[in-house]
């Protein structure tokens, strides 16, 4: 499986991914991207890479010490690679990480208006925990979804 850790050389390609898919939903991603490349999330950020070296998707998990859950902070797949099992593969890696870490839950926040994301996570056992208004973007509702780790 072509999943590997994020490396500093990925910065430009990940910036393109963030600008196309994340900025419209969550605003500026500079800080989060830098954390995934060099800081807090570096060891928990993985990319799905094609044979030609192109990054097709990204998953990042935030794991704060002392918490009984992890947060799926990013899961994004390029549009041209949707419905090829990449999102499922990246999610499975995050779920395995959560289980191996002894966590009880994994959570993810999705924009209410992006129905395909909501359906994707619900298909894999995530359930609505709460709604957040204006957390990332003014006038936008976010849904916090949680899945128990067994």
For the regions a protein language model found, what residue spans apply to each?
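Acetyl-CoA-dependent GNAT
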Residues: 5-74, 78-80, 91-92, 97, ...
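Conserved glycine-rich acetyl-CoA-binding loop
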Residues: 54, 78-92, 101, 112-118, ...
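Conserved N-terminal entry element of GNAT/NAT acetyltransferase domains
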Residues: 1-9, 147-150
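Conserved GNAT acetyl-CoA-binding A-motif
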Residues: 98-110
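Conserved catalytic-core motifs of GNAT/GCN5-like acyltransferases
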Residues: 107-111, 122-143
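Accessory recognition modules or surfaces
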Residues: 84, 88, 139-149
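Extracytoplasmic/periplasmic beta-strand context in beta-sandwich domains
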Residues: 1, 73, 141-143
């Amino acid at each position: 499986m072509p999943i590997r850790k994020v490396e500093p050389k990925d910065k430009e390609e990940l910036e393109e991914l963030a600008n196309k898919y994340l900025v419209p939903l969550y605003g500026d991603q500079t800080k989060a991207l830098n954390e995934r490349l060099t800081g807090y999330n570096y060891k928990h950020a993985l990319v799905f890479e094609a044979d030609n070296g192109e990054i097709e998707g990204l998953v990042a998990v935030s794991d704060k010490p002392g918490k009984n859950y992890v947060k799926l902070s990013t899961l994004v797949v390029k549009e041209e690679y949707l419905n090829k099992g990449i999102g499922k593969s990246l999610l499975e890696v995050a779920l395995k990480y959560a289980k191996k870490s002894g966590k009880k839950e994994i959570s993810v926040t999705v924009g209410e208006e992006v129905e395909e994301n909501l359906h994707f996570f619900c298909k894999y056992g995530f359930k609505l925990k709460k709604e957040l208004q204006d957390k990332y973007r003014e006038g936008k509702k976010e849904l916090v979804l949680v899945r128990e780790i067994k």
